[in-house]
């Protein structure tokens, strides 16, 4: 890994942008379905819209990370914000076809933001403050991102009661537009440009060939690193498992709530989950300063996954509302620990010129696991209930995480012998 050039850290500049983006996202995600239905979409068209968004993200996830490594992460991230602005405009003023176009643009914005500014932030933090400080970098990133999303969701719920220009939910959308534009301008002026790998290597090959070559090199580098392979395999397992929690906790809560006000519980638990992720990130960041060996961090990573699986099993078997609320919060607390340690392991083992590419590959693996899980979960739920599904997913999580641990021990042993 070579020294980053021309790159002062300025963490507050990055974190302020992450905060604005997270707040903007929270303003709309809390009423996402309602926005689409108010624009004339039926429930079937809403499903199509979500599908278009998901397919776009999947298709562009890896190319966007490669593009950031080759042609500049700041540049590609700014393109992602322009796409997000266009999608918000489509949602605010469009009819059904324009809203569907907005879903495609939103998916492109999500994909192009992955492995770009976040990769640049982690890289510059590592070079200015050392590899052992990566846990703190991820802690701050998660804390700002999730807390701003949580606050944005609360504010979004309040704004949703007001219409702008007689159009429902435009207060949320216009506020999100202003914050996204502010983040774009903020980063444009305050974060230094990064030197693209294409300029460092003076590669004159056609862009598509450069992207294919970059992807091949990143995958080859991952195959040589036991830690990177654990991160990528673990991402597939994580996506497969967590999608079952994220998609089905709300209907499960509804069955347990009985006479409780479900809207209040949904809002309270959503906020509690985000707060728990922040707290888990803080705990993991502190642990990373105490445990400085790769093997020790792998153990924490695997222990957090074991704890997540045990919480899932308990939540599936203990069918009481107070217990579920506690276990749901605990699940996200441990997930925050896992996410921070996972990010630290990947960042400390990724080459600079492939950092964004590997982050996008990991994100793609996470989404791929989630897609497969959604297809299989639908079949399981046709015959069995949500608790049984969670037990099956927990079993897969335990097996997959155990495989990651065995794989690391065998590969790391071979590497050390060489």
Task: Enumerate the predicted regions with their spans.
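Juxtamembrane intracellular "pre-TM" segments in multi-pass secondary transporters
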Residues: 1-9, 192-231
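Helix-loop junctions at membrane interfaces in 12-TM secondary transporters
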Residues: 9-11, 92-103, 314-328
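Substrate-agnostic recognition of the 12-TM MFS/MFS-like secondary transporter fold
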Residues: 13-31, 49-66, 72, 80-81, ...
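Short amphipathic helix-loop junctions that connect adjacent transmembrane helices
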Residues: 30-45, 247-264
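Structural signature of the two symmetry-related core transmembrane helices
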Residues: 75-90, 177, 297-313, 394
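A membrane-interface helix-boundary motif in multi-pass transporters
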Residues: 161-178, 260-267, 296, 379-397
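Helix-loop junctions on the cytosolic side of multi-pass membrane transporters
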Residues: 169, 176, 181-204, 406-417
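C-terminal transmembrane helical hairpin of 12-TM major facilitator-type secondary transporters
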Residues: 295-338
